[in-house]
Regions:
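Non-catalytic regulatory/interaction regions at protein termini and inter-domain linkers
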Residues: 1-200
Length: 200
């Protein structure tokens, strides 16, 4: 279970959630992480500030979860993100290396506003997003949450191109704008050769 809306996922699902308010964000992020912890899964959530991380922990604790234990054992990792796509890829593969020896499954989520503080260009962000689609049969699901007001329209369109599934009004939809990673990265490299686009 994804933890919200009576929705279920399959291994390898990469879901884009495009939201307009923090309430929309929390209505998805909190139950998503909670469901993973309750199922004994490894949970990673990337979130940009200490204040927001603390708020997420408090919301999870309010549901009855022992967040201190989850953090201490490594079942739950809250991270602020890194400065380049390669470092994020390494982080992902380190988390995947714990499956299934320590945990049955990896639940990876992120409030993508972390990239506004960490990554220099939209190309770096989209290289990371496309990489998530190249991992063969991952024992994982990925949820990427984009605040529409925070990102340029061109970045939102690229995010659509890198997510096979989209969450809209508590319904998962196959994304008709999705491009396979090889084709997307070729197009991205072609664009990068002529222009570098800032994230905001």
């Amino acid at each position: 279970s994804l933890g919200f809306g009576n929705l279920y996922s399959t291994p390898g699902d990469h879901i884009g959630h495009f939201y307009q308010s923090r309430e929309e964000w929390s209505d998805v992020a909190i139950p998503f992480v909670r469901a993973g912890l309750e199922a004994g899964e490894k949970c990673v959530y990337v979130i940009p500030s200490k204040v927001e991380r603390q708020a997420l922990l408090e919301a999870l604790a309010a549901t009855g979860l022992n967040t201190d234990r989850a953090l201490a054992t490594g079942q739950l990792e809250l991270d602020e993100g890194t400065h380049d796509a390669k470092a994020m890829q390494d982080f992902l593969h380190r988390a995947l290396s714990e499956i299934p020896a320590k945990y049955p499954f990896l639940r990876w989520g992120g409030d993508m506003t972390w990239s506004l503080k960490k990554l220099p260009t939209s190309e770096s962000l989209m290289t990371w997003e496309a990489h998530c689609n190249t991992v063969d049969n991952p024992p994982a699901i990925f949820l990427c949450q984009y605040e529409l007001r925070a990102f340029a329209g061109s970045v939102v369109m690229d995010a659509l191109h890198t997510h096979p599934l989209c969450l809209v009004s508590n319904t998962i939809h196959r994304n008709p704008f999705y491009e396979k990673p090889e084709a997307f990265l070729r197009n991205l490299a072609r664009r990068k050769a002529t222009e570098t686009t800032r994230i905001t």
